[in-house]
Amino acid sequence: MPSGFRFVSRKQGDILRGGEVMRAPYGLEIIESCMSCPHREDRLFCNLPPAAVQRLAAITSAAAYPKGATLFVEGQSPRGVFILCSGKVKLSTSSADGRSLILRVSEAGEVLGLPATVTGKPYELTADVLEPAQANFISREDFLPFLREHGEAALRVAQQLGETYHSAIAEMRTIGLSHSASEKLARFLLDLSADHEEGKGEVRLTLTLTHEEIAQMIGASRETVTRLFADFKKKQLLQVKGSTVIIKNRAGLESVVSS
């Protein structure tokens, strides 16, 4: 059972199998079923034909997880997949000496644990919840027959695996080919802000990652990340207010990347 896994009592609202009306702790509103999900049309795996969605609801167990919960651990035998309905999850790998590298941060609509579940090999990454999240679990015993029965779902799985591959290549390029830590951090912030530009050119981001976690994403030390944020603030490239980062000068960050 994942760390932080919680079934909610009747007094708070049940988290049940099959898509019933539910409430949950951690300030979440549980999405009752894929059929009624307001984001269904925007999400690759969720936007399936009605027959497939109905079958998906029948084999899915919904649960809410707090920040810090672990869905699965690198090297663990694959039990199944998690459809992330809300919240964010970081996917990381660790070395024998305890060093960690965060490969990506997954958001709502992604299916976690796909490669391991499809191949039967151990989970290749560890999945930790960054903020309160709803993640619907489907066991491997149910998921594989579901893919055989519904070709459209199998195609969506292939699409997500392809997107994950391209994302991993981009991350490797950032870490391996960037000349400096400042370039890596600037590129990281630009990637985060790509879909959030506002009318005046400023971009307001809410960071769910700590400086340590950002360091693990860009292959730097926590001290270096903290120093670079201070340097970027001094150069008026950005402002930091708690967990909110306001990018004031996008062109300036782009010049750091291209320098």
What is the predicted function of each stretch?
Residues 148-217:
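Polybasic "coupling" helices that flank or enter modular domains
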Residues 5-7:
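Aromatic (phenylalanine/tyrosine) cluster motif
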Residues 11, 18-67, 111, 116-118:
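Cyclic nucleotide-binding regulatory module and flanking cytosolic helices
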